[in-house]
Amino acid sequence: MSDFSMETLKSLRQRTGVGLTKCKEALEHAKGNLEDAVVYLRKLGLASAGKKEHRETKEGVIAASVDEHGAAIVEVNVETDFVANNSVFRTFVTGLLSDILNNKLSDVDALAQVTSSQEPSLSVEELKAVTMQTVGENIRISRALYTPVNSNQSVGIYSHGNGKAVALVFLSGSDKQEALAKDIAMHIVASQPQFLSKESVPQEVLEREREVFSSQLSGKPQEVIEKITTGKFKAFFQETCLLEQAFIKDPDVTIQELVDRAAKASGEPLKVEHFVFWKIGA
């Protein structure tokens, strides 16, 4: 039976910001004495990390990875760009990708509780506290996403600005089109589309744009309004929809045409299934 109450355990967590497992270990070692447990955690280099958790985190890195079963992307924030480029911090982020892939997780809270692939004696939350102690700044795992990948898909990853913006592209019809998928991912980072296709634009967005166009054309004949509105929607789709955009490396070709050409050349039914685009803080 434990020599401490749940209230003591809660107090230790609130005071130090250290994970549940290590707090239990500390209280067991200290036979339920709160102050001794704090000292125990300080000796492990964990306790002082909790003091940093209120600090604002505006910098950071986005990282992505893929294995044979899925793709992972994670955003981790810190206080300064200096630490965002620190090798210890970067190693922690790389480990998170393995944890996401191994556990197939998109929930940050659930991710915090799994055993770290980098340090099996610690949870992800506890390793985060150790890393905070090492780099001297608050660290926040802001978001994570796991996407399953099948044997007939190619995944492209492109990172810009040392992890300030990252795109993932999922291309179906072949597992040998990583170069094409990466080219499209690079295009996404540069052009920042909001939607995959015209068909994927939400109805409320279309209605909003139509209202804007109508207001701009107030007083004109209906047939003129309809003609101009059609042109404005074409421009809107070319600006916001990935498949309608001009390819950044060859503006005479849209992304859809780029994929169609590759499909014809390879004899494979290629299709952009979806994409993910993240920017730091966005």
From Swiss-Prot:
GO molecular function: translation elongation factor activity
Annotated GO CC locations: cytoplasm
Subcellular location: Cytoplasm
UniProt keyword Manganese, yes or no: no
Primary site of residence: cytoplasm
SUPFAM superfamilies: Elongation factor Ts (EF-Ts), dimerisation domain, UBA-like
A Pfam family annotated for this UniProt entry: EF_TS
Spans annotated as Involved in Mg(2+) ion dislocation from EF-Tu: 80-83
InterPro entries: EF-Ts_dimer_sf, Transl_elong_EFTs/EF1B, Transl_elong_EFTs/EF1B_dimer, Transl_elong_Ts_CS, UBA-like_sf
Record-linked PROSITE patterns: EF_TS_1 (PS01126), EF_TS_2 (PS01127)
Keywords linked to the UniProt accession: Cytoplasm, Elongation factor, Protein biosynthesis
Xref: HAMAP family: EF_Ts
Family per record: Belongs to the EF-Ts family.
UniProt function note: Associates with the EF-Tu.GDP complex and induces the exchange of GDP to GTP. It remains bound to the aminoacyl-tRNA.EF-Tu.GTP complex up to the GTP hydrolysis stage on the ribosome.
Protein name: Elongation factor Ts
